[in-house]
Each structure stands twice: as C-alpha cells, then as structure tokens.
C-alpha cells in the first residue's frame, strides 16, 4: 500500500462539479492499493498518517503530527501510484490491486480513519475526481507499507 502524503493549508475533491470531501489545514493523502496488501498494511499506513511528524512546532522544526495539530485528513484513492514505470513510455498497472480489493481496502482505511480521527474526508473510489489543494511548504512524502 502506498500513500503520497501532502501537507496542505486546505484541499477539496470534486466529482462531476460537486464537492464530495474537503479539509482545512491537514494532510491530503493519495492512496494506492497493491495486490498483496491486506488490512495490516492499511492499519500501518493509518498509524503513520496520524502520527508522522510533518507539522512545525514553535521553533519551526517538523515535530508535530496530524493528531497534535488536530488537522484534517483527506483520503483519495489513486491506483496510478502503484504503476510500474521502469520500462517503456507507457505505465503498466499490473502492480495495482484489482478494483474489488482496492475498494475493499480503501473503504477499510477510511472506516478506521473515521474511528480514530475527528476530521476525515474522502474522494469517491473509482470516480473521475478533480483534486484542489494548497500545498504547504511544499511538504510531500511517499509512504510505502
């Protein structure tokens, strides 16, 4: 399971012109599920997202987590993050999970996030989405479980 974490001042996701998820300060995370993933990887990713210290403290040092600052968490499924780009001029998606497994594990991740954190939003799995964000820093990390 991969998560592209971006620290944001605000972000929203639209589907067909309708806002389906939005946060103020927090983390926008693009999530890709891979064929061998399970709930264990989803649990590990969520733990890291909630506790990874990417927000600045009073001294300007990245020392605070999403939980510490009470920020929002916007989860967006994006199977293209699992692409194999090593060969040729076209990405291969054979390294992405089948849609049924992807949907199951993304929904599980979202359910667990809602149970463990107050401010959680998401896009729609498999939908054509427009993601708007104000990247803060920019601060971006690729997490792989």
Swiss-Prot record:
| Molecular function GO terms recorded | D-tyrosyl-tRNA(Tyr) deacylase activity; Gly-tRNA(Ala) deacylase activity; Ser(Gly)-tRNA(Ala) hydrolase activity; tRNA binding
SUPFAM superfamilies cross-referenced by the UniProt entry: DTD-like
Q: What reactions does this protein catalyze? A: glycyl-tRNA(Ala) + H2O = tRNA(Ala) + glycine + H(+); a D-aminoacyl-tRNA + H2O = a tRNA + a D-alpha-amino acid + H(+)
Query: What is its subcellular localisation?
Result: Cytoplasm
Q: What is its EC number?
A: 3.1.1.96
Gene Ontology cellular component? cytoplasm
User: Motif Gly-cisPro motif, important for rejection of L-amino acids located where?
Assistant: 137-138
Concerning CDD domains, the annotation shows: Dtyr_deacylase
Q: Does the keyword RNA-binding apply?
A: yes
Key words, A-Z: Cytoplasm, Hydrolase, RNA-binding, tRNA-binding
Looking up Pfam families in the UniProt record yields: Tyr_Deacylase
Instruction: Reply yes or no: does the keyword Translocase apply.
Output: no
Q: Which GO terms describe its biological process?
A: D-amino acid catabolic process
**Database matches in InterPro entries:** Daa-tRNA_deacyls_DTD, DTD-like_sf
Record's function text: An aminoacyl-tRNA editing enzyme that deacylates mischarged D-aminoacyl-tRNAs. Also deacylates mischarged glycyl-tRNA(Ala), protecting cells against glycine mischarging by AlaRS. Acts via tRNA-based rather than protein-based catalysis; rejects L-amino acids rather than detecting D-amino acids in the active site. By recycling D-aminoacyl-tRNA to D-amino acids and free tRNA molecules, this enzyme counteracts the toxicity associated with the formation of D-aminoacyl-tRNA entities in vivo and helps enforce protein L-homochirality.
Q: What family name appears in the similarity comment?
A: Belongs to the DTD family.
**Assembly and binders:** Homodimer.
The domain section of the record reads: A Gly-cisPro motif from one monomer fits into the active site of the other monomer to allow specific chiral rejection of L-amino acids.
- State what protein this is by name: D-aminoacyl-tRNA deacylase
Originating species? Pseudomonas putida (strain GB-1)
Gene from which this protein is expressed = dtd
């Amino acid at each position: 399971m991969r998560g592209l974490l971006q620290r944001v001042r605000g972000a929203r996701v639209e589907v067909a012109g309708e806002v389906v998820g939005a946060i103020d300060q927090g983390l926008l995370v693009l999530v890709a599920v891979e064929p061998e993933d399970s709930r264990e990887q989803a649990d590990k990713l969520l733990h890291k997202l909630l506790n990874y210290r990417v927000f600045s403290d009073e001294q300007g040092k990245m020392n605070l987590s999403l939980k510490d600052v009470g920020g929002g968490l916007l989860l967006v499924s994006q199977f293209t993050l699992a692409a194999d780009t090593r060969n040729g001029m076209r990405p291969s998606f054979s390294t992405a999970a089948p849609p049924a497994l992807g949907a199951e594990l993304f929904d599980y991740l979202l359910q667990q996030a809602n149970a463990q954190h107050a401010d959680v939003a998401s896009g729609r799995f498999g939908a054509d989405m427009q993601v708007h964000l104000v990247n803060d820093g920019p601060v971006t990390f690729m997490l792989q479980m």
